[in-house]
Each structure stands twice: as C-alpha cells, then as structure tokens.
Amino acid sequence: MPDLPPAPVRTVFAPSPIGRPSLGLVRMAVYNWALARHHGGTFVLRVEDTDEARVRPEFYEPLLDVLRWLGLDWDEGPGTGGAHGPYLQTERRELHLDVARRLLAAGELYESFSTPEEVAERRTRAGQDPRLGYDNADRHTSEREKAAHRAAGRRPSLRLRLPDGETVFDDLARGEIVFKAGSAADPVLVRANGRPTFALAGPVDDALMGITHNIRGDAMLPLVPRQLAAYRALERIGVARAVPRLAHVPMVLASNAKILNSQQDPAADALGYRDAGVQARTMVNYLAALGWSHPTRGGVFTPAELVAGFDVRRVRTRPGRLDVKRLTDLDTTHLRELTAGEFTEALVPHLAPLDGDRLALLTRAAPALRRRAKSLPEAARAAAALFDDEPAATQEPDFGALQAARDALTALSPWTGETLSALLKGGLAKASVTAVRTAVTGPAHGHLLLDFLVLLGPERGLRRIDGVLARSTAQWHRDRVA
C-alpha cells in the first residue's frame, strides 16, 4: 500500500439506511474492513442518516445485521462505542455546526442568498443552460446586499469556496485523476434552515474521527473536488490533520449489466443470501473477488487470506457483474474445505434443537454430508431425513423387491461400508436397490443411501424397511376389504 501515514490506518464504512443492504454497498464494507485488518488498523462504522427524505429507521438494524453475519467486526461504532462518537451522524449535528461557524469566521465559507429561480434566470440571461445550476455568483454579494436580503426575511445557506484552478487527485485504485477548473460549483455546507449537509458532515466526521483511508464506490468520484476542498479547509482551521486517501472502485452490475439495486432486484439483497443459507465466508470471498483477486489464491480464499493479501491496487477498474451460479458454486467449494468440526458447527443452526444422540449422529454423518451436499440447507435436509424415525418413503416401492432386499440385508455380516457397498453394487437386483433407496433415504437423498445405511446401522436401517413393508401390507389388506 503506497503512502501509508505514520499514524495507524483508520478506515470507515459509512452507509445510509435508505434500503436493504445491497451487495454493492456491503462490498465496500468488506474492502474497508480488509484494509484496516491488513495493516493492524481500526475499522470504523458510521451511519450517515442526515438525508431525512430518504432515511428509513427500519433499515438501520439490517445494516448492522449484515456486518455481524459476515464477521466484519467494527472497532468503533454503534453498539461498540469508541473515543470519537457518537457514530450516528444526526447525533453529531452540533459538532458539524460548530465547525461551520469556524469555517465561516475564517473566510472559507460565504453566505449565499440566491434562490434556484434566481440562479436559473441568471443562467438564461447569460445564454446558458439553466440545468447547469449554481453559478458561484454569491461570492461577490456585498454586505449592503446581504443586509437587504436579511431585511426581506431571507436566510442564507453557507457555501464552501472552491479553488479556481484544476483539482489533481491521486486515487489509490485508479491513479492520478485531473478535474478541470470549474467542473464543480461551490457546494452548500449548511442549508438556509440551519441544517448541515453531507458535504459538510462527511469531511468533518472523517477529520474528527481521524479517518486515514476510505474505499468507496465510483459513484462518489464526481464529489472529489468539493470534498478535497473541504478537507483542506478543515486543515487550514486546525480541525483536520491530513486529507484521507481515497479509492473509488467500480460498482456491481446485475447479470443484465444494469446497476444492482436492492429495492428493485431481490438478487441484490445481501441478507437474502444469508436467509438462503449461503455461508458468510463464501459471501466475503465472492464480494471481494468481484473485481479483485488474491495474489496467490486467485478467486477462492478465506476471510483470513483476504486480510493477509489485501491490496486495493489490485482492484480492477471495470465493473463486476453478479453471477449467482458462480456464487453457489463458490459456496460448495467453501463447504468442501470445512473441517468436519467446522461443518458440524455451521450446520447446527439450520437444524431443530438436537439432543445428545442426534448431535453424536450428526458428528458421525458430517464427513459424508460435507462430501455430498452442495449447500448447508441441502445438508440440513439430508440430516433431518437421517434423524427421522419414520420411514422415509413418500411412495410405495415394489413390495417383493423390498422384501428380497430386506432378507439380504438381514443376512449381511458384518454390517460395514464395504459389505453394504458390495451388496448394493452386485448382490441385489436393480429393483431391490431402488426399493431400498425409496424406503431408507427417500428420493431426495438417494445418493446418500450407502452413507445412511452405515450411519443408521442394522437395527435402525432394517426398522425403516420394516415400516414401509408393514405400511404396504396394511394397504394391501385395506384394498382387499374395499
């Protein structure tokens, strides 16, 4: 990582609770967490909830839930505390306004009385497109004109005076970027109603929280000129010690190449994958690998390996595209790499509460389930079928074929994986194998027949077959009576 400051690295993830957490948003959390952990630094969570028109309280907890699920533990922030709180931006309003007063006194801000209608009229008179917006005209408003506006009951907003020249910016992911002079108008930092804007709150909070690095989406790139100007103004009044290093990474696109939006596309909802049983380590891997590759592990790595190898300069500058099949395949890969103990621990939350006998059976079954299942939910369904004392059959097998299989299994000695495999592969007719599969595992888990027979043992395995035979006999008698 180039140009690391002598002070410890402090990164920030600063989401706004305006919708369900999207994959693109959570990807920024993954990168900032990995950067902080890679350098032994601090990962800060700050909730930017100043946009009253869009913020929804019901989306606050999901932001925390998705980070907890993925193991992206924050060192400072809501629920954790820290020396730089509070960590909800609306609770920091007086801090923002105090800094704004200092900026105004230092001449970094100026009062702006222009209404949108007056700006549009000036643009039109100058032969310009009114959609160009504010024209910096209030920089030159005289004190007499300001007094007249106040006498008329008008209240000013406070704008930051941007530099007149070009802005040269060294992006950690993209390299040097030059913004032409005049590419951005002087931004409002405090509205006429006295409320601070994001253009003030973000830089002030970064400064007061000592943020050194921030990786964010490239939708924020056009804001760089005004944000750099704000950081430098804060330096000049002694609020900021340095300008944070910024990296702008490409957005995540849907499979149809449109921008992912969790409010419009369910596939963008990060928590939906948790609810579907995707492993947290898979999602961290997948999101990090959308445009980034590990220097030695390529596209498959654990969270620990991500931390060890993370370098934002390896982020590609073209957008990543969501591929759900790739995600599910990656989940299977990670499932296979779990130890039996890790697999059992991951599977338990997907099952009904287990007593000691069933937990012991699950522990014995873990290697087979891990080898055969493609996901934790699939493994959980197989485990539930293994625990069930009732016959697994949902359809009646061939009675005669099942009875023949029952006789062969009864005579089998010893009851081992080797003897059972030999019997199923060559000692039984195909119809009998099919009948046993129907009775013991049910159609959904037929590929686990041998594993089920070994795990169930002769007593429980034959009991399942006997249950199906008894049910078939009872049905035969009912049919005769009818």
Model-predicted segments: where are they?
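N-terminal Rossmann-like or analogous alpha/beta NTP/dinucleotide-binding catalytic cores
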Residues: 2-128, 223-230, 237, 241
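Glycine- and acidic
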Residues: 11-18, 45-49, 209-215, 267-268, ...
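Catalytic adenosine-cofactor/nucleotide-binding cores of aminoacyl-tRNA synthetases and other
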Residues: 52, 234-240, 245-391, 441-482
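Active-site cores that bind ATP or allylic diphosphates and position pyrophosphate for catalysis
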Residues: 111, 115-263, 269, 294
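Long, amphipathic alpha-helical coiled-coil segments characteristic
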Residues: 391-420
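Helix-rich, typically C-terminal accessory recognition domains appended to large enzymatic cores
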Residues: 416-455
